[in-house]
């Protein structure tokens, strides 16, 4: 459920958190459907340029759990947020393409492996540090290679999305209750949601 103004999503999430029909939820600045993409140019061993699409996700400390993305190596989300101002998880594909074989990237700056990323970091802002490696998340078609991706953990609003995992039973009633709550908090914006399972 999105509110691109970021004005009401926090209030909405606090209101619905107590609903028994909600299994898990997280706040995020981008989702698995609405996420940022950029082109990443790498060179093969012969010096030929290869273009890749890099996916970038951003959510709170429960984002990986709600999306059922497992951490394969590195810190837990809680530990990462304690240790780093801007913790980032790289996926298996990112590690395969950018991290030298046998090297442990955890605790190192993202810009060490991705020079374009370093150019985009703003002066005076905390450096993005790799907190761990997560499993690949397939968001394209079965014919597309999985995107290398970065997942940022954040604890600072504004958030634009609340992503909810509903319990299977009473789903229709749960959606009706979410709509009713949304209309009470945010009456001027229509209630709209995307079902990830339907989209994919």
Where in the sequence are the language-model features?
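Structured, solvent-exposed hinge/loop segments at the ends of secondary-structure elements
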Residues: 1-96, 101, 114-117, 126
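"Rare, low-scoring activations can occur
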Residues: 6-26, 92-93, 115-200
């Amino acid at each position: 459920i999105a509110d691109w103004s970021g004005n009401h999503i926090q209030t909405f999430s606090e209101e619905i958190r107590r609903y028994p029909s909600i299994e898990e939820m997280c706040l995020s600045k981008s989702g698995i459907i609405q996420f940022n993409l950029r082109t990443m140019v790498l060179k093969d061993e012969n010096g030929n340029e290869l273009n890749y699409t890099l996916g970038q996700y951003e959510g709170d400390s429960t984002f990986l759990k709600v999306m059922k993305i497992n951490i394969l190596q590195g810190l837990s989300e809680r530990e990462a947020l304690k240790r780093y101002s801007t913790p980032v998880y790289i996926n298996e594909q990112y590690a395969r393409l950018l991290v030298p074989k046998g090297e442990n990237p955890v605790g190192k700056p993202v810009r060490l492996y991705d020079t374009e990323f370093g150019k985009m970091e703003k002066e005076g802002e905390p450096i993005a540090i790799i907190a761990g490696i997560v499993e690949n998340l397939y968001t394209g078609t079965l014919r597309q290679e999985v995107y290398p991706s970065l997942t940022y953990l954040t604890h600072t609003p504004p958030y634009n999305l609340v992503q909810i995992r509903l319990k299977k039973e009473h789903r229709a009633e749960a959606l009706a209750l979410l709509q009713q709550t949304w209309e009470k908090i945010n009456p001027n914006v229509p209630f709209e949601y995307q079902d990830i399972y339907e989209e994919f």
